[in-house]
Amino acid sequence: MNEAVSPGALSTLFTDARTHNGWRETPVSDETLQELYALMKWGPTSANCSPARIVFIRTAEGKERLRPALSSGNLQKTLTAPVTAIVAWDSEFYERLPLLFPHGDARSWFTSSPQLAEETAFRNSSMQAAYLIVACRALGLDTGPMSGFDRQHVDDAFFAGSTLKSNLLINIGYGDSSKLFARLPRLSFEEACGLL
């Protein structure tokens, strides 16, 4: 049986964590990015399908390729973030299922239903993006996830000729708390949940 994590860990992962828009000039090492993936890959996905593919943009050249896809409200915070992760999904993720889910012919579930394949890839890569955010927080990093961008431009600029399609962007770094907005409310249990 698992033990509950400490109240301090819960604060770090959830209640005190914030979405950041400003960043300190502290780099994020390649080793840290590898450590992030080493954590987030263990989050569950349907049939262990693991459809997310991540491009970590760290260079000025990479940010310039990304710039035309960004909405005006997301431009500055993305260009100044130490890292911007493009979380994409592989439309042919099922080709890896003989390795990832060897218990049966799971590949055929998706090759026979393109709609199921797309829904599964998008939904599960979104879950994996959430695992990446939690992994960042666990390692002392801050994040700024965004869906306000031109996905077609990102796909053309970074994934042309491949089976990858962009899902969302996540800025990663060490946040500047002086640039945080006042915390916004969340729905109560009664507003968001039901008991049957």
Swiss-Prot record:
GO terms for molecular function: 3-hydroxypropionate dehydrogenase (NADP+) activity. One of its GO terms (biological process) is uracil catabolic process. Its cofactor is FMN. It is an enzyme of class 1 (oxidoreductase). SUPFAM superfamilies: FMN-dependent nitroreductase-like. Its EC number is 1.1.1.298. Keywords: Flavoprotein, FMN, NAD, NADP, Oxidoreductase. Coiled coil: none annotated. It catalyses: 3-hydroxypropanoate + NADP(+) = 3-oxopropanoate + NADPH + H(+). It holds the Pfam family Nitroreductase. Induction: Up-regulated by the nitrogen regulatory protein C (NtrC also called GlnG) and repressed by RutR. Belongs to the nitroreductase family. HadB/RutE subfamily. May reduce toxic product malonic semialdehyde to 3-hydroxypropionic acid, which is excreted. This is Probable malonic semialdehyde reductase RutE. It comes from Shigella flexneri.
